[in-house]
Amino acid sequence: MNLKVLFLLAMVLVTLCLGEDRVTDRRQLCKCCAKLCHEDRDRTIPCSGGNSQFCEFCKRTKQKIRKDCNTQNEAKALCVGYFTGEC
């Protein structure tokens, strides 16, 4: 009985930690993508986060990028900042 409880607690902690990592990665990737789009550079340049797939958003409209990042206020702010030249 106690082992089941401990196992469930461990799973919850692991899930929370992985979730936070994903949020951080998403912010970094969004920032990278926004910068590439704003500078109109080669969009095949890999992101610093090691996940260049996210930069495929650069092939869409800037409004679409803002929409994709809308779930994370910080990421959205980074994108908008790059588009307006504030970063």
From Swiss-Prot:
Contains 5 disulfide bonds. Residues 1-21 form the signal peptide. Expressed by the venom duct. GO terms for cellular component: extracellular region. Its main location: secreted. The keyword Disulfide bond applies. It comes from the Eukaryota. Residues 22-27 form a propeptide. It is found in: Secreted. GO terms for molecular function: toxin activity. Keywords: Cleavage on pair of basic residues, Disulfide bond, Secreted, Signal, Toxin. The keyword Acetylation does not apply. Belongs to the teretoxin C (TC) superfamily. The cysteine framework is C-CC-C-C-C-C-C-C-C. This is Tan_10cys. It comes from Terebra anilis (Auger snail).
